[in-house]
């Protein structure tokens, strides 16, 4: 019998991102209880030697599986030390690969609070609108007009620790330009 190959999309990430992801998932599963019904599978529970963990997130009758890997072929950059993440959506016998943005949106559909449809009417009537979105990563780029109006009205509260975001897990933080907060230039060069 000949070998059959399967190709999977694996996002290269650094080891510390994976540790942060594990920590956030476990915190919200066991401490805050916001990720109820999620299932965490350790590396020793997997039959594949390169799988370091799996997080199963139920989405109705389907589920999202975020699988982390170790011992992969290193990438072209020095920090790609053989760690990666795959994101898979499964329903019965069907499965497909997802990108991190879509995974975060699917998680947002089933978990974590957001504005209700009646919130804008309550805001117009002058009532206090208390529901806020806890899961900012689930909103893709620019939100709807309703969402933008409500975020202008109520600043979202900071959740400590933050909720686990698949997009944040797979984000490439080295190839982004560095941003310095609050510095307009050198004080000695400006003469101040």
UniProtKB/Swiss-Prot annotation:
Residues 171-172 are annotated as: Membrane association. It is found in: Host cytoplasm; Host cell membrane; Virion. A motif (BC-box-like motif) lies at residues 144-153. Residues 14-17, 74-79 are annotated as: Interaction with host APOBEC3F. Residues 159-192 are annotated as: Disordered. GO terms for cellular component: host cell cytoplasm; host cell plasma membrane; membrane; virion component. Residues 54-72 are annotated as: Interaction with host APOBEC3F and APOBEC3G. Processed in virion by the viral protease. Highly phosphorylated on serine and threonine residues. Vif-defective viruses show catastrophic failure in reverse transcription due to APOBEC-induced mutations that initiate a DNA base repair pathway and compromise the structural integrity of the ssDNA. In the absence of Vif, the virion is morphologically abnormal. The BC-like-box motif mediates the interaction with elongin BC complex. The HCCH motif (H-x(5)-C-x(18)-C-x(5)-H) mediates the interaction with CUL5. Counteracts the innate antiviral activity of host APOBEC3F and APOBEC3G by promoting their ubiquitination and degradation. Acts as a substrate recognition component of an E3 ubiquitin-protein ligase complex: mechanistically, Vif hijacks a host cullin-5-RING E3 ubiquitin-protein ligase complex (ECS complex) and the transcription coactivator CBFB/CBF-beta to form an active E3 ubiquitin-protein ligase complex that targets APOBEC3G and APOBEC3F for polyubiquitination, leading to their degradation by the proteasome. This is Virion infectivity factor. It comes from Human immunodeficiency virus type 1 group M subtype A (isolate MAL). The gene is vif.
């Amino acid at each position: 019998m000949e070998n059959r190959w399967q190709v999977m999309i694996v996002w290269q990430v650094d080891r510390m991102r994976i540790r942060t992801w594990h920590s956030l998932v476990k915190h919200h599963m066991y401490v805050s209880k916001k990720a109820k019904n999620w299932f965490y599978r350790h590396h020793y529970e997997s039959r594949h030697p390169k799988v370091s963990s799996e997080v199963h997130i139920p989405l109705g009758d389907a589920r999202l599986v975020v699988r982390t890997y170790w011992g992969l072929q290193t990438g072209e950059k020095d920090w790609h030390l053989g760690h990666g993440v795959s994101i898979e959506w499964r329903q019965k016998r069907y499965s497909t690969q997802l990108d991190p943005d879509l995974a975060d949106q699917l998680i947002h559909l089933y978990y974590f609070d957001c504005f209700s449809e009646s919130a804008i009417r309550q805001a117009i009537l002058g009532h206090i609108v208390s529901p806020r979105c806890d899961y900012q990563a689930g909103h893709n780029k620019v939100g709807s007009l309703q969402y933008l109006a409500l975020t202008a009205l109520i600043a979202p509260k900071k959740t400590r620790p933050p909720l686990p975001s698949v997009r944040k897990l797979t984000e490439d933080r080295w190839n982004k330009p560095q941003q310095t907060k609050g510095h307009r230039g050198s004080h000695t060069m400006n003469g101040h």
